[in-house]
Amino acid sequence: MIQRRKPLPRRRAKPRRIRSPRCVVRGCDRLRVVVCPSCERGDRDWEHGYCLTHAKQEADRRFSLAVRSIGRCEGCGQTEGLQCSHFISRRYLGVRWTRLNAECLCRGCHKFLTERPLEARDRARERLSAAVYDELEEQARRFVGPVDYAAVLAKYPPVAKEVA
C-alpha cells in the first residue's frame, strides 16, 4: 500500500499584513498614537484617535476655541476677528495649552503685541502678576519630554461650533 504524503502548506504570495489602527484624519495613514481618553488604549477597534501631528493640531484647535469662547477682545473689547494670543511662545510645549498663558485678542491687538515683544511682556506681567508670569516662564523652561496629548484633548473637549 502506498502511503500518501500530507501536502505541504501553500505559501502566501504576500505575507499577511497586520492591520494597525490609523489616524482618523482623512488621507493620513500614520499610526494612531493618541486616543481619546474615553476609548480604551490598546484596543484594536478604536473608534477615533490621532497621529502625533494631528493630535497637536486638534489640541491647538480645541484650546483656541476655548480661549476665544469669551467672545470679545481682552484688549479693546471688539467682537470680530478674535484670535488666541499666547504670552509665552507656543514653541514652549510645557505651557502651550495652559489657560493662564493665553488671552483672547482681536487681530489688531494681537498684531500690535506680536510686533512689540517688550510691551507684550510688560502687559503679561501686569495682567497676570509678576510672580505668576515668572512661574509660567520657569515651567516653560523646565519642561522636557513628550506631551501627553490625550490629557490635553481630555482637558479641552470638542466643540461643535466655531467661534468667529
Question: What are these language model-derived features?
Answer:
Residues 1-62, 78-80, 132-164:
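A boundary/linker detector
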Residues 112-119, 129-136:
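Substrate-binding/catalytic groove segments of enzymes
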